[in-house]
């Protein structure tokens, strides 16, 4: 209770708390203002580079090792982890799906991604050696909160990836990685998505470090790629906006869209589809590109916009060729092809009607600026 001369803290039963715990909220009220942008979503998309940069800040110690000071789980417990289960909803779940590919590749332990609202109703297999990672921007997602409580009851450690200090999910978890993305006011998550992927990647590299699954120079190389993300995201925002505007103007009357991707491009396709559903109220479906011939191709009509998340050809020739084959299939049905691809990909230029380019990078690092193109579009602007 706040009065003119004092503040009284009580519990839910009305009992006064004599010495309540306090903490400082590191938050600037101006961060919740538009600051000259037309919308909060537009502003927050452009804050993506800074969100990634802040999430990485201070993670590398002087000795060259990853340093996660805020993680309150003993290193011995991390070494014993033999399975990871990510629990989340919506955009956070897609961030977890992206991270699954990287963590399994780096740490060589299985990673499951569960929708939090389904998790506790299916009798999941949990042990003290299972690490449950709860991802939530707000830290108050009730489905995720209930799921993490269930996991702790079963004896598993829970680590939260969260953007809001002092929220319920980080408070009730065994450990927390804060994303430091700043307030996200828009309904549709943007900068929090890339910050969540960044934090999950840092967690994966830390696990690889404590388990000895990667050499130090390999971890350093992956971290260097992560540190380069803000610059490359900014490149996309600076160079591709007009192409997106022009394409959106041409497709503004489209009644439905398909988003397709493979590997880490699959969850990004799902996230891109979610953005159009949330903001443009347009019927949009995201699929794994390999599922195209198993049903979704029946939805493709003349002029239907189909967005392909194209992996780089370098080192992923088979994956790249499969996606190009999918583009050819829907092109034969008269679809309008929008491709998100690496710079100067000649196969994409040959078949796509419009291309949103991204800089060259390793496959596991290519989803940040792909997200930019899926999110930063007048299709998602309110009329």
What is the predicted function of each stretch?
Residues 1-383:
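A SIS-like phosphosugar-recognition module
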């Amino acid at each position: 209770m706040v009065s003119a001369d004092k503040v009284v803290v009580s519990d839910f039963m009305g009992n006064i708390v004599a010495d309540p715990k306090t903490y400082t909220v590191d938050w600037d009220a101006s961060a919740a203002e538009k600051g000259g942008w037309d919308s909060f979503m537009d502003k927050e998309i452009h804050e993506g580079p800074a969100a990634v940069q802040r999430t990485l800040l201070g993670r590398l110690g002087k000795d060259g090792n990853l340093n996660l000071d805020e993680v309150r789980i003993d290193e011995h417990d991390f070494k014993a982890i033999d399975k990871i289960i990510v629990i989340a909803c919506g955009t956070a779940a897609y961030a977890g799906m992206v991270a699954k590919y990287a963590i399994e590749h780096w740490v060589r332990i299985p990673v499951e991604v569960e929708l939090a609202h389904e998790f506790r109703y299916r009798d999941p297999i949990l042990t003290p050696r299972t690490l449950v990672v709860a991802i939530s921007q707000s830290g108050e997602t009730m489905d995720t909160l209930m799921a993490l409580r269930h996991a702790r009851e079963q004896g598993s450690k829970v680590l939260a990836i969260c953007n809001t200090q002092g929220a319920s999910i980080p408070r009730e978890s065994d450990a927390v990685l804060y994303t430091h993305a700043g307030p996200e006011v828009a309904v549709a998550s943007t900068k929090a998505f890339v910050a969540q992927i960044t934090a999950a990647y840092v967690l994966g590299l830390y696990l690889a470090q404590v388990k000895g699954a990667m050499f130090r120079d390999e971890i350093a190389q992956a971290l260097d790629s992560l540190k380069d993300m803000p610059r490359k995201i900014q490149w996309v925002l600076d160079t591709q906006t007009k192409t997106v505007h022009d394409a959106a103007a041409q497709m503004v009357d489209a009644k439905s869209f398909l988003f397709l991707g493979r590997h880490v491009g699959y969850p990004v396709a799902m996230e891109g589809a979610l953005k159009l559903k949330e903001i443009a109220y347009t019927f949009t479906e995201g699929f794994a590109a390999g599922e195209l011939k198993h049903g979704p191709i029946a939805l493709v009509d003349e002029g239907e916009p189909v967005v392909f998340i194209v992996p780089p050809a370098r080192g992923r020739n088979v994956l790249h060729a499969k996606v190009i084959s999918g583009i050819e299939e829907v092109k034969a049905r008269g679809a309008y092809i929008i491709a998100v691809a690496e710079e100067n990909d000649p196969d994409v230029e040959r078949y796509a009607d419009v291309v949103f380019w991204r800089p060259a990078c390793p496959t596991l690092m290519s989803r940040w600026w792909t997200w930019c193109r899926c999110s930063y579009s007048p299709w998602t602007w309110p009329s």
